Regions:
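PRPP-associated nucleotide enzymes
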Residues: 1-313
Length: 313
């Protein structure tokens, strides 16, 4: 079976991560640029031939709108430049919270984004910790959905935390929390929240033994940090020894940083799917890189190898 040459490129939203992925893969990023017009319109351009190559484009969709449009245009440009295959590597998949109609007259944003990526000509998508696993079914091309548990679990084990329990911040996160609890051999706690409106949480309770436990809250993303900080404070008020969090995607919008620093959270463990704001107080944050995992998956996909063995499910 012929193996086509591989080239890795980055959109402007993920250059920090793409460079690490390329280095872990043993190569350098391909040469590209984005031309910007005076009215704000932009045009990506590849500055080297990609004819007959398998092209991997690394771009998280945060902030969502410009980065998604840039990714779509890079896919289209690669297709028109006669790339053999085009793979979109989207560590953080924006719009994933819009996976269904949760009230009348609203779009299903995740499905629309999937349609746009396929219309642009993508052959395959790689991502990590989708907000809802069923989003994979929105695509008619292969989707490699990686799990950050393969990165978080070794770090958590290295801390040697006694009396550890895993907590879900809400009912929707129970499946993820149960997976971590099984892998670590710990009890599980489920927090229940009543949300008054988007990004505003009402009251919160917990199901499970809290008193005397060191608790790790696991979730796929942290946005305004209202839910997780309320959960941490509630768990401490019920007698927890300590509360940490392991969150894949640090969106951290609005007052998130300040809330975390003012909360009972002892440590917030995140990945580098989205960069932290260097101008903020980051003393509670620990960042684990996903670069090696994505580089490994890129190598396996390119060489037609299975990938399920390299991350925990």
């Amino acid at each position: 079976m012929a193996i086509h040459k591989i080239k890795i490129f980055s959109g402007r939203g993920s250059e920090y991560l793409a460079e690490k992925i390329a280095a872990s893969f043993g190569t350098t990023l391909g040469q590209s640029e984005v031309l910007r017009f005076s009215d704000g319109e932009f045009q990506p351009c590849y500055n080297e031939s990609i004819r007959g190559c398998t092209v991997f484009i690394i771009q998280s969709t945060f902030p969502p709108s410009d980065n998604l449009m840039e990714l779509l245009m890079m896919i289209d440009a690669a297709r028109r430049a006669s790339a053999y295959k085009v793979v979109a590597v989207i560590p953080y998949f924006g719009w994933a919270r819009q996976d269904r109609k949760d009230r009348p007259r609203v779009p299903i944003g995740a499905k629309l984004v999937a349609n746009l990526l396929m219309a642009a000509g993508v052959d395959r998508v790689m991502t990590m910790d989708l907000h809802a696993d069923q989003i994979q079914g929105f695509f008619d091309v292969p989707v490699d959905a990686l799990y950050a548990s393969g990165i978080f679990i070794p770090y958590i084990e290295s801390l040697k935390i006694e009396d550890l329990s895993i907590a879900a911040p809400d009912i929707g996160g129970a499946k993820r929390a149960n997976t971590y609890a099984k892998l670590l051999g710990t009890p599980i706690i489920i927090s229940h929240k009543e949300r008054a409106k988007a990004n505003v949480v009402g009251k919160m309770t917990a199901i499970g033994e809290v008193e005397g436990r060191n608790i790790l809250i696991v979730d796929d993303m942290i946005d305004t940090a209202g839910t997780i900080c309320m959960a941490a404070d509630m768990l401490m008020s019920r007698g927890a020894k300590s509360v940490r969090a392991a969150i894949t995607h640090p969106v951290l919008s609005g007052p998130a940083y300040e809330r975390i620093n003012d909360s009972a959270l002892e440590e917030v463990i995140v990945t580098d799917t989205i960069p932290l704001n260097p101008d903020k107080d980051l003393h509670k944050f620990t960042v684990l890189t996903i670069a090696d995992m994505f580089a490994d998956v890129i190598e396996r996909v390119h060489n037609y190898k299975e990938i399920s063995s390299i991350f925990f499910k």
